Amino acid sequence: MIDWVTAVLPCLHVPVDAGRVLSVAPDGSVEWESVKFSRVTGSFQSSISVRSQGSDGNGKATHLYVDGNPSKWLQGHNIVGSDDLNGLMIAFYARMLSLLNIPHHLESYRQVLSGQYELKRVDINYMFELPTLIDVRSWLHAAEFKAKTRHGRPATAKGTLYFGKNSRRWSIKAYSKYDEVNCGKKAHGVPEEIKKTGLVEWSKNKLRLELTLRALQLTDINLNFAKNWSTETAYTVFKEYMGRIEMSGNTLLTDTQVINLPSALRMTYVCWKQGICVTDMVSRATYFRHRKVLKEFGIDIAVTVDRVDNSNVVPLIRVLEAKPASIPSQYDNLIFSSNRVSSF
């Protein structure tokens, strides 16, 4: 599903007045100023940040810079949602103009309808089914030690796993949506009307995997304009990036195998086994040479040896190879559809 979107939408309009932030020098001169964001509230008190941008030379702004979660804004929740980025943004655009009392500008509207606008960030996520909530938490714990991407090992914070958390291009995070909804924070909660449908309970044994694509990466893969997105794009891109997560199935060598290793390689293996950072012990060239050889034995010294039960390794891999969890038809009316725009 499409989750968070940051976009620059064509919209000729009288600038939305939300105030300004100024930097004033000691002599009283203004060093710089920036227009503040307005918070536009949608369904169930969910809001999106909006700011006027550009100028036509006659006092009107030419674009709206929007930043937020159109799925949650329209649906009241983002537990499940639509892969239709263009449909979501068209419905969001129409509703937003109405709430801001901005008259429709025909040419601007045509541009939005045809996807002629720039995307600065897109988040895509899907749910993957495990037997229980305990299994979801165990998966996250095991992946902390067993998984990595080109960004390296994941960082963890409050039960969420982050791959490339501070990357300016792309990142992945994994977490329990059920735990997030029930963490007690207002921003992550869902309305009682949604809870009563059973959707939150349905998410209890689901692992959430989320891909964030930022401006530089969107440009590189030619998805920085909405016109290049179809309803299949989200899952296709998501699957490709999930394939970048490497899972280690590290197992310890037998005594005979250790004895038969060349002495230098044996020392590297023993240090790794004891939890010592190998990169502190050998040169960069030696590290990569030893890593390549040890990988033939099913050992990746780039992944720290840990005490996690190896029985978790197969589920780690199988989850990433599996298809996202099927959403029961009883929840169809809780998911945005361009065929039912009037209900959102």
UniProtKB/Swiss-Prot annotation:
GO terms, molecular function: DNA binding; DNA ligase (ATP) activity; endonuclease activity
InterPro entries registered for this protein in UniProt: G2P, G2P_C, G2P_N
Domain of life: Viruses
Catalytic activity: ATP + (deoxyribonucleotide)n-3'-hydroxyl + 5'-phospho-(deoxyribonucleotide)m = (deoxyribonucleotide)n+m + AMP + diphosphate
GO biological process: DNA replication
EC code: 3.1.21.-, 6.5.1.1
Alphabetical keyword list: DNA replication, DNA-binding, Endonuclease, Hydrolase, Ligase, Nuclease
Family, similarity comment: Belongs to the inovirus G2P protein family.
Function of the molecule: Isoform G2P plays an essential role in viral DNA replication. Binds the origin of replication and cleaves the dsDNA replicative form I (RFI) and becomes covalently bound to it via phosphotyrosine bond, generating the dsDNA replicative form II (RFII). In turn, viral DNA replication initiates at the 3'-OH of the cleavage site. After one round of rolling circle synthesis, protein G2P is linked to the newly synthesized ssDNA and joins the ends of the displaced strand to generate a circular single-stranded molecule ready to be packed into a virion. Isoform G10P protein binds to double-stranded DNA and prevents hydrolysis by nucleases. Additionally, G10P is an inhibitor of DNA replication and may have a role in the transition from semiconservative replicative form DNA replication to single-stranded DNA synthesis in the life cycle.
Protein's name according to its UniProt entry: Replication-associated protein G2P
Species of provenance: Enterobacteria phage I2-2 (Bacteriophage I2-2)
Lineage: Viruses, Monodnaviria, Loebvirae, Hofneiviricota, Faserviricetes
GN (gene name): II
